[in-house]
Structure formats: structure tokens, C-alpha cells
């Protein structure tokens, strides 16, 4: 319900550039049905992230239904930044069989998109020239699950977030080392906490390409229970 017309236009342009079929399926009827079903149980409680996640799960259910009916494997769109801090809905946008961007941080996704618009790899199956609309790369990222939502409402700016995550994950550094380098202590500590508590989501994420030094899975696995911390 909160998907902007700009995002719909960008999706149409992306499909056109790639030569893909585009179908638009509104989730409003399903959302209204869930609202009615859960209303007696949610009575007296304000709308919050629960309703946001229901939207994502309805999308995941719809996409999986199309995958079942027509056969193609559903790909997830989450990147390493989002999966690191749990900025994804389990059984929602995490639903799928393969995660193409699983080992790419958000800032790297932007750089790869810009590169692909300029280059066509020799073995690529896609078209030459631009394949990603510039506005998709340049506009503020948003899950669009509530009015005027931006990723930075919940997370540090991606350049800062990725710097922290690369140090903690790829380099196996510590929060104390980052703080000693001059980064804001509250921000670093919060990102580290999110990294730990999102472990249960990552365990249920689909497999994907390994590109970096340490991907989530065999390279980096931590206990889920008992509020585990390394220090």
C-alpha cells in the first residue's frame, strides 16, 4: 500500500531495460483480510512493525505462489548489509531459493550496478548498455512499508554502516578498535548488537554467491541462544 508511484515507474523501467516481463499484483485485499482477521487480537495496540512485516510476508507468499505455479526459482534481494543487521523480514523478503546479493554490501551493490551500466561481461546473458535505472541507484533506499519511510530512519548511513560491518565481519575486528579510530561509540555498539541478534535470521536465509573474505554460513556462525557474545 505504501509503494510509491516512483518505485512502480522504476520497476517498469528496470524490466524494460532488461527485457523482462512485468506483472503488478496489488496486496491491498490480502492486507485488509489480515487486518480484519487480527483485529480482535490486536485490539488496543498501536500499529507498529508487526503490520509492516505482514506486508512483506504477503509479498513473499504471493511471489512464492507464482514460483510454484510457473516454475522459476524465486530470488531474494537482500544484501549483506541488510542481512548483517537483520534489516529484512523473515518469511517475507527473505523468502526464496537463492540470494544473488547475499555477499555484497549495499555500497558495493551500488558500485556494481554503476559498473554494469557501463560494461557488459563477455559471458553475460543480459543486454548491453544500461540495465539499472540511475534513479534506483541514487535515491534514498526505502522498504516502503510505512509512509515516507527511509532505511536511514532505522540504520546509520550505508557508507558508515558498511565500514563498521566490514571491520567486524571481514576483518574480524572489534567494536573497541573502531571506537578507538574515532567512530561514534553508540553507533558502533548498536551495529555490533544488531549483528549478533540477527544470527537467527541468517541461519534461515537462502544460499548465495560467496565473494568476500567471510560470508555468512560456513565462514561465520555464532550461537543463537543465551544472548551469546564473544566478549
Which residues make up each language-model segment?
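ATP/NTP-dependent adenylation/nucleotidyl-transfer catalytic domains that generate, transfer
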Residues: 1-231
Amino acid at each position: 500500500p505504501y509503494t510509491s508511484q516512483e518505485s512502480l515507474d522504476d520497476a517498469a523501467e528496470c524490466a524494460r531495460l532488461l527485457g523482462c516481463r512485468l506483472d503488478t499484483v496489488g496486496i491491498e485485499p490480502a492486507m485488509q483480510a489480515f487486518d480484519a482477521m487480527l483485529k480482535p487480537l490486536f485490539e488496543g495496540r498501536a500499529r507498529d512493525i508487526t503490520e509492516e512485516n505482514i506486508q512483506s510476508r504477503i509479498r513473499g507468499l504471493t511471489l512464492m505462489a507464482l514460483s510454484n505455479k510457473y516454475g522459476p526459482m524465486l530470488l531474494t534481494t537482500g544484501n549483506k548489509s541488510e542481512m548483517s543487521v537483520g534489516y529484512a523480514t523473515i518469511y517475507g523478503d527473505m523468502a526464496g531459493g537463492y540470494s544473488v546479493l547475499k555477499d555484497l554490501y549495499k555500497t558495493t551493490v551500488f558500485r556494481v550496478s554503476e559498473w554494469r551500466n557501463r560494461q557488459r561481461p563477455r559471458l553475460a546473458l543480459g543486454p548491453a548498455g544500461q540495465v539499472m535505472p540511475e534513479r534506483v541507484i541514487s535515491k534514498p533506499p526505502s522498504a516502503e512499508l510505512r509512509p515516507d519511510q527511509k532505511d536511514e530512519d532505522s540504520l546509520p548511513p550505508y557508507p558508515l554502516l558498511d565500514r563498521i560491518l566490514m571491520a567486524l565481519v571481514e576483518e574480524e575486528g572489534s567494536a573497541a578498535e573502531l571506537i578507538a579510530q574515532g567512530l561514534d561509540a553508540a553507533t558502533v555498539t548498536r551495529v555490533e548488537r544488531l549483528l549478533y541478534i540477527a544470527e537467527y535470521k541468517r541461519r534461515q536465509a537462502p544460499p548465495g554467491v560467496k565473494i568476500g573474505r567471510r560470508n555468512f554460513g560456513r565462514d561465520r556462525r555464532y550461537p543463537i541462544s543465551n544472548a551469546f557474545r564473544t566478549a
